[in-house]
C-alpha cells in the first residue's frame, strides 16, 4: 500500500474519531447556548440591555471560550495525559508519581484530586436537569399553550434516559456524532443569519468592550461573570474524555466545528438583542423563525439528552476509576458491550443520580432557577485542574518554574475570577453542588483512610508468607484433590482465610493459588505485563495480577493466563475460592474518630461482595469470617 493510501486512511480515521468525539465530548458545552446569555442578563443582575452592555457581555463570552477552551484546555491541559488518559483522577495520579508518598504536598494533591472528582458529581446532577429542562422550555416559545407540560415532559425524558442505561447505548451511540454535527451546524446558521442583520455585533471580538463593560459596571459585572462561566460548562470533558478518542480528534473537532459554531451562535443572540432587547425572554429559541421553532425544540431536546448521556457515562467511568484507586467501596459494575471495554453500567450510581436529579427538577422548577446552582462545581474543578497541571509541568515535564508560573498565573487569575463570582451564588443554589461535593469528599476520604487503617492492622497482625510456606512444605498437612484460590490484598502475608481453613479443616488442596490484584497509577496495563506467577513448589503458586485504574479485574482471564504460562487447565466449576469476610469493629484505638469509624464500618458492610465484583460463581466460594478492630 502506498504512503498516499496510508495517509488517506489515517485522515479518514481522524475525521471519524472527530465526529464521534463531537457526539460525546462536546454535548455539554454545545448545549450551553440554550441558557447562558439569557442567564447573563437575568433581571436579578440588573444589567441594562444597552448596546454597550450587550457588546460587553458577548465580548466576555467570546474571550472566555478562546482563553479557557481554545488555549488552556486544548493547547495546555490536554498535553498532561496519563498514558493517553485524561480527567482529574488521571491527572492526580500523574502528579503524585514523582512526589514523596509521605510528603504533605502529596496529601494535598491527593485531596485536591478527590475533591475535583467529587465536584464532578455535583455537576453531573445539574447538567441533565438544566439541559433537558431548558430544551423543553422551548415549548413556551413554539407552542405557549403547552407551557404547563414543561415539567412533566422533562421528568418523563429523564426517567426514560436513566431507564435505558442498563441496556447500553452502543447502538444509538453511533448516531450521537452525526446528530451533534447537525446541532452545531444549525446553531451556527441561526447565528450567522442574525449577525448579517446586525453586523455591529462583530466588534465584540475586540476585548476593549469586555474591559469597558467590567470597568463601567464593576460589581455587577463581577456577578455576571458567574453566568459567563456557563459557556464553559463541559470544557473539562475535552480533557476527561481524551482517553476514548485521543487528543488530535478532539482538537480537530474543537477548532473546526465546535468553537466556531458556539461563537457564531452567541454573536447571533447578541445581534438579536441589539435588534430587539425584549428577545431576552428566550434569545436562543427566538433566533429561529416561527415555522422552525418546534423542530428546534425537538433537536435541542435530543442534543441535551446526548449531553446528559455523556455526563452519565462519565460518572460511571469516574466511579470505576475511583474504585480501582481505592477511594470508593466496591460496587457492582456491569459491562453493556462485548466490543467496547469502556461501556459500563453502575446500578447504584445510576439510580442515585436519577433520584437526586428528579428532586432538583421538582424543587427548582425552571432552568432560570437552576442556573444559579450551575457553575460553581465547574469552576472548582477548573481551578483544581490548573493546580494539578502546574505540578505535572514542574515535577514530571521539568519545565522552567518561571515559565510555569507565568502560564499558570494567567490561568489561575481567570479560573479564580470565575470561581469567586460563582461563590456569590451559593445562597441562590450554589449550595447544592457544594453540598454534594463536600458530602462525597467526606465519604471518599473516610473510606480511603479506613482502608489504610485496615491494611495497617492486618499487616501488624499478619504472618509473612514465604517462611510460612517453607514450614508448611516441611510439615505438610493432608492434601486433598482440586484447586483452591485464596484472594488476598497483600501478596507478602498469609491470607487469613488460609489460616482459618488450616485451623478448622486441617487440609491443603493439591493445587493452591494465592492471588493478589494490584491497581497501578496508569490507565491500562499491557497484557504481557499483567500476570506474574511464582512457583513456590509442591503445587503452590503466588499470582500477582496488575490492572490500570481504567480496567476491571477479571479472575477468569487471570486464570487463563496462569494456565497458559504454566501449562495447566482450570475448570472454574471445579475450583474453590476462599475469601476472608472482614467485619470492621470501631474502637477508640488511634486512627479516626469513633463516629467516622462507624461511617466507614457502614460503608464496608454495604460494599459489593467480592463474588459480584470479581464475577466469581457464588456456589464456588468459601467465606471465612474475621474481625478487624480499627
UniProtKB/Swiss-Prot annotation:
Record keywords, A-Z: Cell inner membrane, Cell membrane, Ion transport, Membrane, Potassium, Potassium transport, Symport, Transmembrane, Transmembrane helix, Transport
Entry coiled-coil feature ranges: none
Intracellular or extracellular location(s): Cell inner membrane
Catalysed reaction, written as an equation: K(+)(in) + H(+)(in) = K(+)(out) + H(+)(out)
Presence of the UniProt keyword Transport in the record: yes
Gene Ontology CC annotations of this record: plasma membrane
One Gene Ontology MF term: symporter activity
HAMAP family in the cross-refs: Kup
Record-linked PANTHER family: LOW AFFINITY POTASSIUM TRANSPORT SYSTEM PROTEIN KUP, OSMOTIC STRESS POTASSIUM TRANSPORTER
Function comment: Transport of potassium into the cell. Likely operates as a K(+):H(+) symporter.
Family, as annotated: Belongs to the HAK/KUP transporter (TC 2.A.72) family.
Identification of the protein by name: Probable potassium transport system protein Kup
Organism: Burkholderia pseudomallei (strain K96243)
Taxonomic classification: Bacteria, Pseudomonadati, Pseudomonadota, Betaproteobacteria, Burkholderiales
Gene: kup
Amino acid at each position: 500500500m502506498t504512503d498516499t493510501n496510508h495517509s488517506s486512511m489515517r485522515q479518514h480515521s481522524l475525521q471519524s474519531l472527530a465526529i464521534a468525539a463531537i457526539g460525546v465530548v462536546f454535548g455539554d458545552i454545545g448545549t450551553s447556548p440554550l441558557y447562558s446569555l439569557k442567564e447573563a442578563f437575568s433581571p436579578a443582575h440588573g444589567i441594562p440591555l444597552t448596546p454597550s452592555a450587550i457588546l460587553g457581555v458577548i465580548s466576555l463570552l467570546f474571550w472566555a471560550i478562546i482563553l479557557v477552551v481554545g488555549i488552556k484546555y486544548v493547547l495546555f491541559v490536554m498535553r498532561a495525559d496519563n498514558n493517553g488518559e485524561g480527567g482529574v483522577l488521571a491527572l492526580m495520579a500523574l502528579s503524585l508519581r514523582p512526589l514523596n508518598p509521605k510528603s504533605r504536598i502529596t496529601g494535598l494533591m491527593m485531596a485536591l484530586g478527590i475533591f475535583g472528582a467529587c465536584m464532578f458529581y455535583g455537576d453531573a446532577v445539574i447538567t441533565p436537569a438544566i439541559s433537558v429542562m431548558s430544551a423543553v422550555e422551548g415549548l413556551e416559545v413554539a407552542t405557549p399553550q403547552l407551557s404547563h407540560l414543561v415539567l412533566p415532559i422533562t421528568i418523563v425524558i429523564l426517567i426514560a434516559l436513566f431507564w435505558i442505561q442498563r441496556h447500553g447505548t452502543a447502538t444509538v451511540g453511533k448516531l450521537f456524532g452525526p446528530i451533534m454535527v447537525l446541532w452545531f451546524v444549525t446553531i451556527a446558521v441561526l447565528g450567522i443569519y442574525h449577525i448579517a442583520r446586525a453586523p455591529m455585533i462583530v466588534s465584540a471580538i475586540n476585548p476593549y468592550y469586555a474591559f469597558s463593560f467590567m470597568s463601567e459596571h464593576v460589581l455587577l459585572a463581577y456577578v455576571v461573570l458567574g453566568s459567563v462561566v456557563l459557556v464553559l460548562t463541559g470544557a473539562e470533558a475535552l480533557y476527561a474524555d481524551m482517553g476514548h478518542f485521543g487528543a488530535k480528534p478532539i482538537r480537530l473537532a474543537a477548532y473546526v466545528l465546535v468553537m466556531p459554531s458556539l461563537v457564531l451562535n452567541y454573536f447571533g443572540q447578541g445581534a438579536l438583542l441589539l435588534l430587539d432587547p425584549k428577545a431576552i425572554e428566550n434569545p436562543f429559541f427566538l433566533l429561529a423563525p416561527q415555522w422552525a421553532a418546534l423542530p428546534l425544540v425537538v433537536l435541542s431536546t435530543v442534543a441535551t439528552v446526548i449531553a446528559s448521556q455523556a455526563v452519565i457515562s462519565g460518572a460511571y467511568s469516574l466511579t470505576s476509576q475511583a474504585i480501582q484507586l481505592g477511594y470508593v467501596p466496591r460496587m457492582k459494575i456491569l459491562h453493556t458491550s462485548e466490543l467496547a471495554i469502556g461501556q459500563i453500567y453502575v446500578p447504584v450510581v445510576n439510580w442515585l443520580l436519577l433520584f437526586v436529579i428528579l428532586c432538583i427538577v421538582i424543587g427548582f422548577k425552571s432552568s432560570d432557577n437552576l442556573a444559579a446552582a450551575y457553575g460553581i462545581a465547574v469552576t472548582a474543578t477548573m481551578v483544581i485542574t490548573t493546580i494539578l497541571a502546574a505540578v505535572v509541568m514542574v515535577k514530571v515535564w521539568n519545565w522552567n518554574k518561571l515559565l510555569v508560573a507565568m502560564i499558570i498565573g494567567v490561568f489561575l487569575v481567570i479560573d479564580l475570577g470565575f470561581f469567586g463570582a460563582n461563590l456569590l451564588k451559593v445562597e441562590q443554589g450554589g449550595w447544592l453542588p457544594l453540598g454534594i461535593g463536600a458530602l462525597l469528599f467526606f465519604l471518599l476520604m473516610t473510606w480511603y483512610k479506613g482502608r489504610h487503617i485496615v491494611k495497617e492492622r492486618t499487616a501488624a497482625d499478619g504472618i509473612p508468607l514465604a517462611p510460612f510456606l517453607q514450614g508448611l512444605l516441611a510439615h505438610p498437612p493432608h492434601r486433598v484433590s482440586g484447586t483452591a484460590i485464596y484472594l488476598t490484598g497483600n501478596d507478602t502475608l498469609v491470607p487469613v482465610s488460609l489460616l482459618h481453613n488450616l485451623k478448622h479443616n486441617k487440609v491443603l488442596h493439591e493445587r493452591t493459588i494465592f492471588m493478589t490484584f494490584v491497581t497501578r497509577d496508569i490507565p491500562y496495563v499491557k497484557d504481557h505485563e499483567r500476570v506474574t506467577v511464582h512457583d513456590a513448589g509442591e503445587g503452590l503458586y503466588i499470582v500477582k495480577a496488575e490492572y490500570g485504574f481504567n480496567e476491571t479485574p477479571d479472575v477468569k482471564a487471570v486464570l487463563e493466563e496462569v494456565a497458559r504460562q504454566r501449562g495447566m487447565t482450570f475448570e472454574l466449576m471445579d475450583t474453590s475460592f476462599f475469601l476472608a469476610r472482614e467485619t470492621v469493629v470501631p474502637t477508640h484505638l488511634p486512627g479516626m474518630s469513633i463516629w467516622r469509624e462507624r461511617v466507614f464500618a457502614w460503608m464496608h458492610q454495604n460494599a459489593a461482595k467480592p463474588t459480584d465484583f470479581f464475577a466469581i460463581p457464588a456456589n464456588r466460594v468459601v467465606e471465612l469470617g474475621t474481625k478487624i478492630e480499627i
